[in-house]
């Protein structure tokens, strides 16, 4: 099986991709994983270190072909505040709980969590359930290339974006025990002015290799 051994960050490649893989947040943090692209190309992701991939990155195959990484839509909560000060206050409470959080211009996005939803509503936030790609902040110790997506990720190991110690465990455990079905038309997605993401269709199947 042909291997993908390097990663090109966002905006670092212009060639047409030979295939693409549709991956959620968890499956975008991998080192070695057998994958099948949306057009059927089978390959082995075989990186030097576990690397946090982002939508728009490219995996480089041994023969030079590229596989585009597409961030799959997943169930999220979009948290909206009344003003900038309120938004900062909400962000502080999420950060205090070590929740992976995506910071938007006027809102915050987290994975769906009914406990946290109740908490932020109690703090006066408006909460909307959406489905969109999840791209949380990498944290203060993330590599600059990971934070901005404009450098080659060939030999950088990245810590995970963060850990939710309330209800989710995002450690580097195997996801071989469950399947992801990403091949829908996404008719039930909520798209608003904050979304800004294209939703690619197709299936990508990933299996862990120890």
Swiss-Prot record:
Keyword Secreted: no
SMART domains the record matches: UreE_N
Composition skew (Basic residues), residue ranges: 197-210
Subcellular location field: Cytoplasm
Gene Ontology BP terms: protein folding; protein-containing complex assembly; urea metabolic process
Keyword Membrane: no
Segments for region (Disordered): 136-210
This protein's UniProt keywords: Chaperone, Cytoplasm, Nickel, Nickel insertion
Domain of life according to the entry: Bacteria
Any single Gene Ontology cellular-component annotation: cytoplasm
Biased composition range(s): Basic and acidic residues: 145-169, 178-196
InterPro entries: UreE, UreE_C_dom, UreE_N, UreE_N_sf
CDD domains (alphabetical): UreE (cd00571)
Main localization of the protein described in the UniProt heading: cytoplasm
A molecular function GO annotation: unfolded protein binding
Annotated function: Involved in urease metallocenter assembly. Binds nickel. Probably functions as a nickel donor during metallocenter assembly.
Family, similarity comment: Belongs to the UreE family.
Name of protein: Urease accessory protein UreE
UniProt organism field: Bradyrhizobium sp. (strain ORS 278)
Gene this protein is translated from: ureE
């Amino acid at each position: 099986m042909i291997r993908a051994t390097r990663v090109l960050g966002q905006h670092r490649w212009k060639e047409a991709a030979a295939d693409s893989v549709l991956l959620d947040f968890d499956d975008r943090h991998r080192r070695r994983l057998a994958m099948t692209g949306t057009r059927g190309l089978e390959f082995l992701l075989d990186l030097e270190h576990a690397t946090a991939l982002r939508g728009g990155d490219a995996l480089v195959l041994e023969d030079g072909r590229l596989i585009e990484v597409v961030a799959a839509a997943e169930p999220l909560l979009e948290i909206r505040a009344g003003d900038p000060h309120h938004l900062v206050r909400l962000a502080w409470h999420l950060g205090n709980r070590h929740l992976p959080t995506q910071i938007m211009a006027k809102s915050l996005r987290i994975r769906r969590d009914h406990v946290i939803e109740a908490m932020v509503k109690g703090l006066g936030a408006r909460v909307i359930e959406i489905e969109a790609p999840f791209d949380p902040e990498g944290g203060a110790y993330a590599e600059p290339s990971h934070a901005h997506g404009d450098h080659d990720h060939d030999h950088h190991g990245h810590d995970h974006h963060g850990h939710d110690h309330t209800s989710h465990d995002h450690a580097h455990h195997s996801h071989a025990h469950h399947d992801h079905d990403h091949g829908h038309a996404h008719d039930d997605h909520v798209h608003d002015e904050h979304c800004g993401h294209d939703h690619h269709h197709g299936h990508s199947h990933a299996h862990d290799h120890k």
